[in-house]
Amino acid sequence: MMIEKQKALEMAISQIERQFGKGAIMRLGDTAKLNVEVIPTGSLELDIALGVGGVPRGRIIEIFGPESSGKTTLALHMIAEAQKIGGTGAFIDAEHALDPVYAKNLGVNIDDLLVAQPDTGEQALEIAEALVRSGAVDIIVIDSVAALVPKAEIEGEMGDSHVGLQARLMSQALRKLAGVTSKSKSIVVFINQLREKVGVMFGNPETTPGGRALKFYATIRLDVRKVDNIKQGNEIVGSRTRVKVVKNKIAPPFKQAEFDIMYGEGISREGSILDLGTALDIIEKSGSWYSYKDIKLGQGRENAKQFLKENKEIAEEIERKIRENFNLAYNKIKSAPDAIVE
């Protein structure tokens, strides 16, 4: 009886996959069996939480969260990772707030970065579509959905009512964009803010602007939150960030990743290596001392991170072991000479 039920279930699953594509249904315990091409996110923990080692090509991604939580930092890291493997990145700056010096600190080659500062939401989305259609751009970041103001609203009077205009614009644009993106190798990343729904008594009052279309069309939705400050003495030097994968169509969702974002330099690779290395017992921690094999890395987390920063070979050796443990590809990270701003 059980075998028959199992057979019937397998048949139903294979029929669903034939009709709606691989990954339309999966067991939560499954590891991602999809063979997808990815671009790393710049955070080892997040690559692991996504289940496939990064963000998948030919898909739409949404990164949302409160202000100053690290959304743009994460998106810029994705551009830097795409450039490291020889790709091209584009940044559609609807907020007119891109800081080139900060982008350079994160490892983005700003000389090769394509930047657009569109006047209207329509223009921003048409530029994105044209770049995807070209097939020559690996990652396109749109910052942010809230700043994609429809032309009618810009040209209208101050007090005019424009209910639902932005949602309609997003819905129309995403229908086209989703089609061309899925046939391409491009990743389209939308950065979104959070809004409070008025008068919500039960459930989550938080919502994202731009209507519901993006929630449907996004393959992956990442909820980015600042958890804590990172201090050195009395000085705040960074923030501990938590990213929750609230939607994932290519691997089981609801996984979480925590990592350090250091002010002025972005996601701390050394912090990730230290945390994951300790969790996997590759790095030993006794009291506040961290050690690897017979090498003392330092007392306290920040000191151990500094040691790994100065001793790149040891950091790379530990990272390789972590990646092997999670079956992630290892790209030797070259620190580009122009990626360091004194």
UniProtKB/Swiss-Prot annotation:
Its main location: cytoplasm. It is found in: Cytoplasm. GO terms for molecular function: ATP binding; ATP hydrolysis activity; ATP-dependent DNA damage sensor activity; damaged DNA binding; single-stranded DNA binding. ATP binds at residues 65-72. GO terms for biological process: DNA recombination; DNA repair; SOS response. Gene3D superfamilies: P-loop containing nucleotide triphosphate hydrolases. GO terms for cellular component: cytosol. Coiled coil: none annotated. Keywords: ATP-binding, Cytoplasm, DNA damage, DNA recombination, DNA repair, DNA-binding, Nucleotide-binding, SOS response. It holds the Pfam family RecA. InterPro entries: AAA+_ATPase, DNA_recomb/repair_RecA, DNA_recomb/repair_RecA_CS, P-loop_NTPase, RecA-like_C, RecA-like_N, RecA_ATP-bd, RecA_C_sf. NCBIfam families: tigrfam_recA. Can catalyze the hydrolysis of ATP in the presence of single-stranded DNA, the ATP-dependent uptake of single-stranded DNA by duplex DNA, and the ATP-dependent hybridization of homologous single-stranded DNAs. It interacts with LexA causing its activation and leading to its autocatalytic cleavage. Belongs to the RecA family. This is Protein RecA. The lineage of its organism: Bacteria, Bacillati, Bacillota, Clostridia, Thermoanaerobacterales.
